[in-house]
UniProtKB/Swiss-Prot annotation:
GTP hydrolase that promotes the GTP-dependent binding of aminoacyl-tRNA to the A-site of ribosomes during protein biosynthesis. It catalyses: GTP + H2O = GDP + phosphate + H(+). This is Elongation factor Tu. Belongs to the TRAFAC class translation factor GTPase superfamily. Classic translation factor GTPase family. EF-Tu/EF-1A subfamily. Residues 81-84 are annotated as: G3. Monomer. Residues 60-64 are annotated as: G2.
Length: 394
């Protein structure tokens, strides 16, 4: 049968496999690839190819990640799988592979393990919104009651971290069985993908979200006024619309009187466009790099937050020494550095290069902030850590 041409008309969703080491994440990824390729919806990727994940540099951090793509009847998926636990932590914190949802792989023979817990916690912290559970190695468990016990444990663990544990789909399968073509387990992989199709919603496209543009530069155009430039992160801005300037200084309102791209005047700019926005009645000194233009009321300025942070190792160009509570580096948000003071969690004396940690931060100026916003921690322009806002506290 001839390979069908990739239908780009299907909605696109980013997912990944998460879970404890040796519970079968990579085997499951390979099984999904094989089962869907047998249906003509994917090109098969073998376990060895996924396992030998290439090294990637994301913001200077070395991460091993395997990316594969496949389709179901309903959707096109990009799927990410990491060989090592450290790679998962880095991947999730840096947002190197944004996930709209995840498949949590738990070995039915072993039940939830420490990394199962850590991956669920990380998913909660970095904003992976939906999880589907796959109990792998179910063929190794004779006792139906034991399977039910493991399922219950996983559901309780998910509930503990704020996921709807009782409602999450749980599929019992055997990825090795599916790879070997055993019909019963092939069916379970199809059932898993059906659950992913139906339970993980298609994400809202960037262009449908409320308008936001980080300001990179500010100019005055004689006779026309102040122009700010930047890349539209999300949403649409139309000429004549009211917008807010948020961050660093008190929030002000203004009106967009013009949109320019490549020296041409447009009626609107949208997510992904590099544009200049002409602001009515705004003086050049009233706006600066590091602020954002946003749909009124859609985002607010904050100074205090909790962040989930990965600290670069010496080999990744990070610090050679630990840091302590009271550390005052620069926090790079979107387009600018802002000094902030770090408080470590109770009982944590210091943070070593290579660690991941939840820290509390107080910035010296407020910035437009929301949960899930990524940042870098820098010293003298050099990135020493990467993080994501997990909770806004003030």
């Amino acid at each position: 049968m001839a390979k069908e041409k990739y239908e780009r008309s299907k909605p696109h969703v980013n997912i990944g496999t998460i879970g404890h080491v040796d519970h079968g994440k990579t085997t499951t990824t390979a099984a999904i690839s094989k089962v869907l390729s047998d249906k003509g919806w994917a090109s098969k990727v073998d376990f060895d190819q996924i396992d030998a994940a290439p090294e990637e540099k994301e913001r200077g951090i070395t991460i091993n990640t395997a990316h594969i793509e496949y389709e179901t009847e309903k959707r096109h998926y990009a799927h990410v799988d990491c060989p090592g636990h450290a790679d998962y932590v880095k991947n999730m914190i840096t947002g190197a592979a944004q996930m709209d949802g995840a498949i949590l792989v738990v070995s039915a023979a072993d039940g939830p393990m420490p990394q199962t817990r850590e991956h669920i916690l990380l998913s909660r912290q970095v904003g992976v919104p939906y999880i589907v559970v796959y109990l792998n190695k179910s063929d190794m468990v004779e006792d139906e009651e034991l399977l039910e016990l493991v399922e219950m444990e996983v559901r309780e663990l998910l509930t503990e971290y704020g996921f709807p544990g009782d409602d999450i789909p749980v599929i019992r399968g055997s990825s090795l069985g599916a790879l070997n073509g055993e019909e019963k387990w092939v069916e379970k992989i199809l059932e898993l993908m059906e659950a992913v199709d139906n339970y993980i919603p298609t994400p809202e496209r960037a262009v449908d979200q409320p308008f936001l543009m980080p300001i990179e530069d500010v100019f005055t155009i004689t006779g026309r006024g102040t122009v700010v430039t930047g890349r539209v992160e999300r949403g649409v801005i139309k000429v004549g619309e009211e917008i807010e300037i948020v961050g660093i200084k008190p929030t002000t309102k203004t009106t967009c009187t013009g949109v320019e791209m490549f020296r041409k005047l447009l009626d609107q700019g949208q997510a992904g466009d590099n544009i200049g926005v002409l602001l009515r009645g705004t003086k050049k000194e009233e706006v600066e790099r590091g602020q954002v233009l946003a749909k009124p009321g859609s985002i607010h300025p904050h100074t205090n937050f909790k962040g989930e942070v990965y600290v670069l190792t010496k080999d990744e160009g990070g610090r050679h020494t630990p840091f302590f509570t009271g550390y005052r580096p620069q926090f790079y948000f979107r387009t600018t550095d802002i000094t902030g003071a770090v408080t470590l969690p109770d009982g944590v004396e210091m943070v070593m290069p290579g660690d991941n940690i939840t820290m509390t931060v107080e910035l010296i100026h407020p910035i437009a902030m929301e949960q899930g916003l990524r940042f870098a921690i820098r010293e003298g322009g050099r990135t020493v850590a990467s993080g994501v806002v997990s909770e806004i506290t003030k």
